[in-house]
Amino acid sequence: MKVSVTKNTIQSLKLDAVAFPISKSEKDNALKEVAAKTGVTVALFEKDFSADESSLMMLYPDLELCAFKRVFLVGLGDKPGLDACRSAMASLAKKVKELKLATVGVDLSGAKALSETANDSVDYIAQTAVEGFHSGLYDFNQLKTNRVKELKSGKSEDDEPKQAVEELVLATDAKILSDVKKGAETGDIIATSQAMVRDLVNSPSNYMTALDFAERVKASGEKHGFKVTVFDKAKIEELKMGGLLGVNKGSVIPPTFSIMEYKPEGESLGRVALVGKGVMFDTGGISIKPSSGMGDMKADMAGGADVLGAVEAAARLKLPLEVIGIVPATDNMPSGSAQNPGDVLTTYSGITVEVDNTDAEGRLILADALTYVKETYNPDTIIDLATLTGACIVALGETTAGLFSNNDELAEKLYKAGQRAGEKVWRMPIWDEYDKLIKSNVADVKNVGGRSAGSITAAKFLEKFVGDHSSWAHLDIAGPAFPGMTNGGGSGSTGFGVRLLVELMRNWK
């Protein structure tokens, strides 16, 4: 979808539809302005349009006055903020998609006033609008068409999701044109990177193995200009990454270890390492999961996909920050060669782990990756993302990720980035008292700590593999990354984490 910005009068736009965002507090005045611009009669519909958040009404303009064919009134609610803007634009996109309209405009002449209400900038309002519209348009349609090869190779010239809308036009005033254009361009980059992540996470495991994922990483690096190195099984064995190899023992598909390196052309503000869990399909291994909802376990690589999306977006936005992305990838399968409960693994760090439960596999592969990135790249900050625990969903639901960190400043930055980006996180404790829950009698540590504090003990386990690094955060994205993943709800991937990470990196100091 093409995204463009214009200062031309709204009436002159030859489009299938034009939308007017309207808040409840400004409803009366806004409707009068819409009437003046479109020729619609306010008295015929003003009582029927509530202006509640994401509410919609379609009208037909005076075609002698306007070049566009339809009018949409889009509700922003009482005190519209960034989340309301995203939600409203997503609602609009869904309706436009349903009606199969090809060209759509949005009147953003009021972006300045909206930015003041939302306490943010004009460019961020435009960015948010584009992100929301892209989100509402998204469909996972690759396996319903002849696009299977494109999905696996990532090398098609048209490898973005197929969308009904051909162009989104943001119409605004000349005074804020440059700000709206800047925000629209940024929003388009972030949203398309996030859509790519959603495609990867929604892909069935027979189309997205560890090998397939590595190929997608290579294709993205080649297209967007960041370096990619992929370790094969022989290299992983040479490095003695016992966590990744242990999880992979039950699979006939070899593991991969993908490394992404983005470096800015000019001076760098620092080096950030992103580590993502890449369990391509999680049966639980010998500690096998119930069959109900197991198909959603194709989404257990969402953290790894997020890392690819964030690195890709950083490269496309040309951020002045060095970004290292690491994704250990494998599936977790039961077989005669699979690891057993009670086995002891030696990780890349040399720390030994008692595998008390083979379904706690994500932390095992992350353990190797965390130590590797710390020792190899010495980053200023390490952030890992993983659909790690059902316990985090119990604690925070499906809208919020768990945040665990050994650095108060980093935790605060992530919290604020999440609030602004609409991908919220909430900090959880990682006090030393929890260490006793993962104490092992036969190894240095156990990979699970029992029923209580499951998300916390998982974070405490990971903490051991960053050692003395003083700026680390773990994001448990099990709830928001794939709503319904633990109950067979089948809601599909959200791409949660991409906007959060990009927002953090764009404001790096």
UniProtKB/Swiss-Prot annotation:
Root EC class: hydrolase
GO cellular component, as recorded: cytoplasm
Alphabetical list of InterPro entries matching this protein: Leucine_aapep/pepB (IPR011356), Macro_dom-like (IPR043472), Peptidase_M17_C (IPR000819), Peptidase_M17_leu_NH2_pept (IPR023042), Peptidase_M17_N (IPR008283)
Taxonomy, superkingdom: Bacteria
Cofactor binding note: Binds 2 manganese ions per subunit.
Major location (coarse): cytoplasm
Protein name: Probable cytosol aminopeptidase
EC number: 3.4.11.1, 3.4.11.10
Family, per entry: Belongs to the peptidase M17 family.
GO MF, one example: manganese ion binding
Gene: pepA
